């Protein structure tokens, strides 16, 4: 019996949710979400979780399953998602549908992650506290001194990536880059990847409109309810950081909306750049 994992990927707002629900219904599969933001609770508007009707039509996994206060890594996702996939195949599924736009999560499922040392929760909490007081630039500079290679390769504005790399350096006494072997981990199932794409102007228009819809649906109120947790890892992301700035009265709402739209477009471009290097993806215009 065949065991095929169909991964539907693509930039934010391209239409992955509708496409994946359709495929899941076709194959009698649940939808396994591969989204590093939708996995957190209490962030439904800003992460564009599937609608109530979509969630009712098909069973979804990894949607709002982790508390916003909990640190959750691509390594955690690899362990849980691969175990789930294996169990569902053992239950008789021949094709499973996975969908998302998180590059590191998808790569973790397809190729496995390098064997990094165990994390240190106390050290991680200390680094996040320092982030709030000193800013990401100070931590990035510390990473540069300990691991120039990783510093040159990652987005040093991404506080989560900087903190994870720095944590590994401090725990192990070795550069984060020294653990990256690039060896692929074998899987007991076939993987097929479908990438969804649209003309750039159409995609950007959809992104801009989605942000406006989020505001109408209550994004500001959602972010306000999360103010006590603003320093948590889950909230260091587009759509939340900008509204926090608005709630701090540092920028007007119109500017926050503009920044969310711009930063989301930049993220979509980064996603496409990453995946265009993968020859195994079959691209589909939607």
Model-derived features: where do they sit?
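Phosphate/pyrophosphate-binding catalytic cores of soluble transferases and nucleic-acid-acting enzymes
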Residues: 1-286
